[in-house]
């Protein structure tokens, strides 16, 4: 999109990582989201949900924190790659809880979820819209969400604020973008 001709017909999806995070993580981007791209409209923004395999012994955030403190580096979290909302949410949780976990990046969020469901990683922060089908099918157990208020989609799942981590608040977002001009 950044290199496309601004013809009024070329549009794409922009989200959290390539539009807001990558510029600070990677010094040699071939585009500048501030000068090469025009935002058109915000389509959605929503919290992430911390999920574990249903056979996991972890049922609460406190369970995870206790296990991580007992064995630093003994728990893993998957993500859809470096610098995205999956990873940054987990890193924010680690920082605020004073724990250390191992990041296992995948080429996509769905690959990270698949390995979580297979029991190969401990947990993942995922967008609610992509985790919900697996939560409803009892293939994932939700632990907490990253919004200020509980979600009507998961009314029995606490927020990180409720369980003592008010700074673990993350909203992922996506919108339509076009080339500048």
Tell where the protein language model's regions lie, with residue ranges.
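Short secondary-structure boundary segments
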Residues: 15-16, 54, 127-129, 147-148, ...
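Paired acidic/hydrophobic, glycine-rich loop segments that form the ligand-binding mouth/hinge
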Residues: 8-14, 122-126, 142-144
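Short, hydrophobic alpha-helical packing/hinge segments within bilobed ligand-binding/sensory domains
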Residues: 112-113, 131
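C-terminal lobe and pocket-closing loops
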Residues: 45, 131-181
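Active-site-proximal beta-strand/loop segments in catalytic clefts of secreted hydrolases
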Residues: 14, 80, 105-107, 127-128, ...
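Short, high-confidence coil segments that cap the C-terminus of an alpha-helix
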Residues: 9, 72-73, 116, 121, ...
């Amino acid at each position: 999109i950044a290199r496309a001709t601004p013809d009024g017909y070329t549009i794409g999806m922009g989200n959290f990582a390539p539009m807001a995070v990558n510029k600070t993580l990677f010094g040699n981007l071939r585009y500048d989201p501030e000068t090469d791209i025009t935002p058109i409209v915000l389509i959605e923004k929503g919290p992430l949900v911390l999920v574990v395999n249903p056979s996991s012994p972890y049922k609460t955030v406190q369970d995870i924190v206790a296990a991580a403190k007992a064995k630093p580096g003994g728990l893993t979290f998957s993500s859809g790659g470096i610098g995205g909302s999956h990873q940054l949410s987990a890193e924010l949780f680690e920082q605020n809880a004073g724990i250390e976990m191992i990041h296992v990046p995948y080429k996509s969020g769905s690959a990270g979820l698949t390995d979580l469901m297979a029991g190969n990683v401990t947990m993942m922060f995922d967008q609610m819209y992509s985790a919900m089908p697996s939560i409803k099918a009892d293939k994932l157990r939700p632990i907490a969400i990253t919004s200020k208020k509980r979600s009507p989609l998961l009314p029995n799942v606490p927020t990180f604020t409720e369980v003592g981590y008010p700074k673990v608040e993350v909203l992922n977002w996506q919108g339509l973008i076009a080339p500048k001009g």
